[in-house]
Amino acid sequence: MGSKIPLPQYETKGSAGLDLRACLDSNLSLQAGTSQLIPIGFAMYLEDPGLAAMVIPRSGLGSKHGIVLGNLVGLIDSDYQGELMVPAWNRSDTDFEINPGDRIAQMIIVPVIQADFEIVDEFNETQRGEKGFGSSGIN
């Protein structure tokens, strides 16, 4: 792993996401309406339970070509130690070609807070209360 395709990197100084590249031996045609696991050529282990990695779509592939992740967002826990794969989903009506080395997703490293829960009889009152979807308005 990691010898054919460069390791993930930030494309610009302001990039939040590391680009993940398709580690393929040849071009792959992702048929319209289908998904396929794409190897990205490396394994990782974060180790620190205060961190996790999230794999998310690249905005241009999603908005211009309909290529997103089959699981929408991938969460990589700090104790995972295996090879990473990207579940690419072609939600368009046109086949899409993925070439070896193409940037197909991005990964961000995020802090994690593991919450402790407790049972309570009632909550402190707030202005919003139980008002749900759309209750805070749009303007």
Swiss-Prot record:
TM regions (residue ranges): none
One annotated GO biological process: dUMP biosynthetic process
Entry keyword set: Hydrolase, Magnesium, Metal-binding, Nucleotide metabolism
UniProt-listed CDD domains: trimeric_dUTPase
Cofactor: Mg(2+)
EC number(s) on file: 3.6.1.23
Catalytic activity: dUTP + H2O = dUMP + diphosphate + H(+)
Keyword Metal-binding: yes
Metabolic or biological pathway, per its Swiss-Prot or TrEMBL entry: Pyrimidine metabolism; dUMP biosynthesis; dUMP from dCTP (dUTP route): step 2/2
GO molecular-function terms, A-Z: dUTP diphosphatase activity; magnesium ion binding
Source taxon at top rank: Bacteria
InterPro entries the record matches: dUTPase, dUTPase-like, dUTPase-like_sf, dUTPase_trimeric
Keyword Chloroplast: no
Sites where the protein binds substrate: 58-60, 71, 75-77, 85
Function: This enzyme is involved in nucleotide metabolism: it produces dUMP, the immediate precursor of thymidine nucleotides and it decreases the intracellular concentration of dUTP so that uracil cannot be incorporated into DNA.
PANTHER family assigned to the protein according to its UniProt record, in alphabetical order: DEOXYURIDINE 5'-TRIPHOSPHATE NUCLEOTIDOHYDROLASE (PTHR11241:SF0)
Family: Belongs to the dUTPase family.
Protein known as: Deoxyuridine 5'-triphosphate nucleotidohydrolase
Gene, per the UniProt record: dut
